[in-house]
């Protein structure tokens, strides 16, 4: 008798995606982050759902409702901190996942890659709107500063900003719509994840060597299910440690002060996972130029497949490209540090240098290095 998982219309789909899926035998731990991101999304949706049961999206009561969740709701504090720090874990996994794709040339699967970029933008939008909901000082001023950037768009900018605000400033209407979108987007993200996996399973997974692995495949279960569970345990341990021992480590103290439109915080800055993009935005003195650089800092990923000049897919056997890749990582860490510093000497000039280097590595140095390595190998 045939196993039900291979015949049942619904179970058959799950079986072909999670059990009998042929996977390359050489996948390293860098391939764990896809499943970890799935778990992060599930955790965020579940904790978010329970938080939404107690949260009120009104300027008069939003801050107090978050306080009420932490003080009066059974285990409300752990829900709130799991949700806030879960977002940080989400972005750590996201950036490592994208980094893996860049290092091993997974961007050559263009459909999967482009859906991934779309997912990255969707998660960033969701995180930004979520940061506004507690209605603390940094929530209010962060929302004001970032939405105001759209006013740099010629001709329609000012109208667009007021349309998003639902008035002439960030106020009750803004908070209500941000809550609505923050609730809706994760479900759109979940649907996009399905499409992401659909395209991935059309081609099959890449592997560290970048060489087709059709001749050497193993079933996903039990080999990679066990491997993913190990990664999951490590991530959940890290998240639990963060939530239970130092829940406010990655947050901003200013957000424990209720939003006050009459009092600007000394340093307005986003959450740590947006600091690199914020540093690129600030490094250009012109408003429209800064906004363009901000968008391009992420959108540049879309043209990476076009800039691939090497005859090898992966960087595994390309030491010169490896050096550039790790220089890019160091540069992004520098930008993250600069984004959290005040706008003064020497931080401004360091930020400008790091921003130029960021775009130079991706647009110029990496393609040149790829061609150079081909020549060195006489290809």
From Swiss-Prot:
Binds 2 heme b groups non-covalently. InterPro entries: Cyt_b/b6_C, Cyt_b/b6_C_sf, Cyt_b/b6_N, Cytb/b6-like_sf, Cytochrome_b, Cytochrome_b_C_euk/bac, Cytochrome_b_N_euk/bac, Di-haem_cyt_TM. One of its GO terms (molecular function) is ubiquinol-cytochrome-c reductase activity. It comes from the Eukaryota. GO terms for cellular component: mitochondrial inner membrane; respiratory chain complex III. A ubiquinone binds at residue 201. It is found in: Mitochondrion inner membrane. Keywords: Electron transport, Heme, Iron, Membrane, Metal-binding, Mitochondrion, Mitochondrion inner membrane, Respiratory chain, Transmembrane, Transmembrane helix, Transport, Ubiquinone. The keyword Transmembrane helix applies. Its cofactor is heme b. CDD domains: cytochrome_b_C (cd00290), Cytochrome_b_N (cd00284). It is a multi-pass membrane protein. Heme b b566 binds at residues 97, 196. Heme b b562 binds at residues 83, 182. Its main location: mitochondrion. The chain crosses the membrane at residues 33-53, 77-98, 113-133, 178-198, 226-246, 288-308, 320-340, 347-367. Heme 1 (or BL or b562) is low-potential and absorbs at about 562 nm, and heme 2 (or BH or b566) is high-potential and absorbs at about 566 nm. The cytochrome bc1 complex contains 11 subunits: 3 respiratory subunits (MT-CYB, CYC1 and UQCRFS1), 2 core proteins (UQCRC1 and UQCRC2) and 6 low-molecular weight proteins (UQCRH/QCR6, UQCRB/QCR7, UQCRQ/QCR8, UQCR10/QCR9, UQCR11/QCR10 and a cleavage product of UQCRFS1). This cytochrome bc1 complex then forms a dimer. Component of the ubiquinol-cytochrome c reductase complex (complex III or cytochrome b-c1 complex) that is part of the mitochondrial respiratory chain. The b-c1 complex mediates electron transfer from ubiquinol to cytochrome c. Contributes to the generation of a proton gradient across the mitochondrial membrane that is then used for ATP synthesis. This is Cytochrome b. It comes from Micronycteris brosseti (Brosset's big-eared bat).
